[in-house]
Amino acid sequence: MKGLITTALAVLLLAGCAGHQTPAFSPTLDEVFATRRSIRAYEAGRTISEAEVRELLTATQNAPSWANQQPSNYYVAIGAEKREAVLELIGGNKERVINAPVFIVSTFERGKSGFFRGTPTDATGDFWGAYDNGLSNAYLILKARAMGFDTLIMGMRDADALRALFAIPDNETVLAVIALGYRAQDPATPAHRPLDEIAKFF
């Protein structure tokens, strides 16, 4: 009888421990905004699957764009060979992101956003494409944070070499390379301009 009681207590203890496991990372939208940072040091040895990157990029399909033109495209370096090649094309950022397991090249198709039948609708022209790509990238990095990942958007890149590496069509502008991984440390919260400085109410 004593043995049965001991066994029963052990089972209850294990069940209780199982019910108190650390919950999965599931932040609120405000927590995503508050914890997203441009990360310049990544944990080594950690991986991100293609399925996870696909889920991440699916979020960009919900980003708004000029007349729903959806000019943004992404080229994902997830294999070792392409990843190593990208590292050589991002200048001084190489050492900052050397442990990031994935790099995403962000482009937009010129002549789509801001154009009607091949003619720009206003003086903004292809800047609308860059604007839309920025919106799409914002969705990407926020979704990444919601999934527990971290990012760094890098403008320092050899666009011509990246175009050749990924066979990017000539009608696309290579805008940025985004590192994707896990932060090695929590950076300090940077100073932000006061709301009353950036917003005017009338």
Name every feature range the model reports, one short phrase each:
Residues 6-15:
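Bacterial N-terminal signal peptides
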